[in-house]
């Protein structure tokens, strides 16, 4: 079997993207890094986004950290998801930064969260810490769009969380708010503050927040797909 090669330009169709992702299934991160001419770090402590960057290289992703989807021409977002030996997610999934100001008139339909989750290429990767990073294998990809029920679940959580932000309650939001979608602080250090709305409508400084999918959402999504296959 010939070895796969990284895509040198963004894929032109979903079929091409999925076919490339399927070729990576079963390879270890160390093998894929070596084939792409990269060095595999010993762990992810200083290179938290390394797996995502590696797979972006292999799949010809274009967006980098820009707000559009990773495969902007196709409207597809790439999400790597660390899983245990049973294929269950090991952590929550970052979606996008939560806007803390300028939210008047924003609806679920026009929200950044919905835009990012409209079409997602999920790639499970072995994530148990007992497996050295270079030996962790890439799993079967899933090209997914939310069904009606999933869209409703996400919408309800998003509306609840955005109401709290708009009403000046951002500091009261905990990871427990939202059944499937949560908001958590997202900052490398506690000094990186951003503007938000306070209880009396005043401007306050607070930690940047991010939207994350909870494990119960991604777990059900992956289980349903891989039982069907």
UniProtKB/Swiss-Prot annotation:
Localization annotation: Cytoplasm
Coiled-coil intervals, chain numbering: none
Single annotated GO MF: DNA binding
GO cellular component, one term: cytoplasm
Entry-linked Gene3D superfamilies: DNA mismatch repair MutH/Restriction endonuclease, type II (3.40.600.10)
One Pfam family linked to the record: MutH
Sorted UniProt keywords: Cytoplasm, DNA damage, DNA repair, Endonuclease, Hydrolase, Nuclease
One GO-annotated biological process of the protein: DNA modification
UniProt-listed CDD domains: MutH-like (cd00583)
Family from the record: Belongs to the MutH family.
Protein purpose: Sequence-specific endonuclease that cleaves unmethylated GATC sequences. It is involved in DNA mismatch repair.
Name the record gives this protein: DNA mismatch repair protein MutH
Organism, scientific name: Escherichia coli (strain SMS-3-5 / SECEC)
GN (gene name): mutH
